[in-house]
């Protein structure tokens, strides 16, 4: 073989390697699932076309193991009702067995549009059977999650979806999100593809197993993921009305001129703290922000910008953190995690809680010290001043009466709207390291 022939042979082999590598890696995405939409699905509808990208349209963190569910919900169908922030031409879901002690076996999973808000009835012609790696059955080990294959479904923005799962055997404690502020449903037996909703006679205030819904879209540029506590969780928002502050933010991003076309993903857990993990079975704590940042925020599909709304529980919940610098150091660490993924971080000031049963003047001083550092511009890339937006001008330690839900800690629906309106949407664009 001559030298020129040898070079030609090597070039040909290199081209083959490139082609084979391309064939292997197309359709296999990283944890954020950016390429999964190109894979084939054996569900009721074909996977969406390849032009577009995956973006999360809804999310809810796994909070704890649901009490009194030692055997799970075997031989029962769970129909979760969730609300989209943006639409798309295809969809996929993520199920979590984070707090399970046994494998979770799901033999039937479906996705449909709801015929009416908060209703278990599926809209005509929208029921889709879901598969996982081309199988109708998925087994999720304890502590793990599974993302379904893509199905073609025209998903509208600001619409309710029905995600139904059936498990035939005991699975151990159920991974759940307790403060959904949304009615979901349970039925006896395998009713996952039942469209009328009549079998779903048991109502539930929880989301179970389901932690994310993504859509395939070419109209949405990315996602804003919010890491927060009960204020972001919307624990005092009107049930079934989608009036959390993140819902109002999603509405602004959809409708306002020149707004970035982002979805909004809610990563709020009631009682959540920056520094301290909560107990396994507590519905009011969850893993700390530092512990769950990667799982609940950074790994969501299409995230471009992170908004952080937390820190107050570190001050008012035992063990109370008396050193504001410790809280700020934790917030800075959250920023570092996001910057490692080239994500921008907008941070919120800590809101007033005067009049709440946990209020003490010395604790409010700590809150103000944290806020001073946040406002200095040396913690986050940008700041949204939730404190200024919600406080009573006559008594800045308290919420404005029109924005107070009544417990003097959590906002009302009007307060949640004021939070969303306080955020300058231009701050959500781009990325830049925080100054130190």
State the predicted function of each range:
Residues 1-227, 237-240, 258, 431-436:
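N-terminal secretory targeting modules
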Residues 58, 79-80, 103, 109-112, ...:
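Conserved SGNH/GDSL esterase-like catalytic core that processes O-acyl groups on lipids
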Residues 282, 314-316, 351-436:
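Catalytic His-Asp segment of secreted/periplasmic serine-dependent ester chemistry enzymes
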Residues 310, 349-350:
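A cross-domain feature marking catalytic cores of carbohydrate-active enzymes
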Residues 331-339:
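Surface-exposed amphipathic alpha-helices with a cationic face
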